C-alpha cells in the first residue's frame, strides 16, 4: 500500500475487512470497491464481504493498481489512512455471520479443553496454531506457541504456514470474526481439519514479541522504495513475458516431434 495505492484508498488487510467494515463504511448503501496490486486478494476480500452478508454492493477492481497504472491514472505513495485507526469495530452481527459461515464450510468450533488435548497430541498429530490478527496485535500479546499468520496472507499463501493438509489447524483471534472467516476460506481451499475458538472465546495472551529466530525490521517503507516503470517499459516487459510463455507452451510438442530424448525400458 505504501509503495503504491489508488488515491483515496484506505489500507485494510484482507483478513480484517469483515471485522472492520461497519466502522469503515457505516452506510449500508454505499458501494464498496476492493483492490489489491492485481486480482487475487481483491477477489478474496470482496467475496469475504459478500459471504458475510454485507448489504452494500461490493466490487473487486479488475487488475488492481497495475491495471490502474497501465490505464494512465496516477498512483499515490507513502502512508495513508489505515483501517485499524478508524475506531473500535462493532463485532456482534459480524461475529454471528462469520461463525455460521465457518461451520457451514466444515470448520470446527472448539473450546480450551479441546485445544489443550490437541496440544498434548501434537507429537503424533501435527498442530498448526495460528494467530490471524495484525502483526502488531500479535507482538503486543499472544497465546503461547501461536505463530503470527495475518488472515488475508494466510489464505493467499497458506502453504507458507501449513505444512500438512491433513494436520490440525487452529486459528486464533480476540474478536470472534477474523478466525472463523479465515477458517471458512481454508476449508474451501481443501484443508481438512480447521478449527476456531467457540463463541469467539478469547485466549489470554501469555507471550509478547516475536518467536525466537523470527526477524522483524522496524519502520515502514516509503516512497523512496517504490518502483513503477513508465508505461512504455512496462508494455515492453509484458510483451517479452508473453512471448516467453508462448514459446514454453510450444516446447513440449516440439520435443515430441523432434525426438530429442528417448530411453529404452532398461535405461
Task: Write out the residue ranges for each language-model feature.
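Rhodanese-like catalytic fold shared by cysteine-dependent sulfurtransferases
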Residues: 1-128, 132-267
Amino acid at each position: 500500500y505504501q509503495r503504491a495505492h489508488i488515491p483515496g484508498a484506505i489500507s485494510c488487510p484482507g483478513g480484517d475487512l469483515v471485522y472492520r467494515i461497519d466502522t469503515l463504511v457505516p452506510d449500508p448503501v454505499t458501494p464498496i470497491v476492493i483492490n489489491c496490486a492485481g486480482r487475487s486478494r481483491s477477489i478474496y476480500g470482496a467475496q469475504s464481504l459478500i459471504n458475510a452478508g454485507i448489504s452494500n454492493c461490493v466490487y473487486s477492481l479488475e487488475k488492481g493498481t497495475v491495471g490502474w497504472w497501465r490505464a494512465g491514472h496516477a498512483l499515490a505513495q507513502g502512508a495513508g489512512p489505515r483501517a485499524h485507526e478508524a475506531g473500535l469495530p462493532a463485532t456482534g452481527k459480524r461475529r454471528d455471520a462469520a461463525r455460521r459461515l465457518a461451520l457451514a464450510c466444515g470448520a470446527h468450533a472448539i473450546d480450551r479443553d479441546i485445544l489443550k488435548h490437541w496440544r498434548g497430541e501434537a507429537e503424533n498429530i501435527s498442530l498448526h496454531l495460528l494467530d490471524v490478527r495484525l502483526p502488531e496485535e500479535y507482538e503486543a500479546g499472544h497465546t503461547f506457541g501461536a505463530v503470527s499468520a495475518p488472515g488475508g496472507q494466510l489464505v493467499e499463501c497458506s502453504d507458507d504456514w501449513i505444512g500438512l493438509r491433513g494436520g490440525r489447524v487452529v486459528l486464533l483471534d480476540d474478536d470472534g470474526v477474523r478466525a472463523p472467516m479465515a477458517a471458512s476460506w481454508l476449508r474451501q481451499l481443501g484443508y481438512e481439519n480447521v478449527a476456531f475458538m467457540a463463541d469467539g472465546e478469547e485466549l489470554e495472551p501469555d507471550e509478547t514479541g516475536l518467536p525466537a529466530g523470527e526477524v522483524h525490521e522496524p519502520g515502514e517503507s516509503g516512497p523512496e522504495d517504490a518502483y513503477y516503470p513508465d508505461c512504455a517499459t512496462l508494455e515492453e516487459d509484458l510483451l517479452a513475458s508473453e512471448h516467453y510463455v508462448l514459446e514454453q507452451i510450444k516446447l513440449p510438442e516440439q520435443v515430441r516431434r523432434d525426438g530429442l530424448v528417448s530411453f529404452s525400458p532398461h535405461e
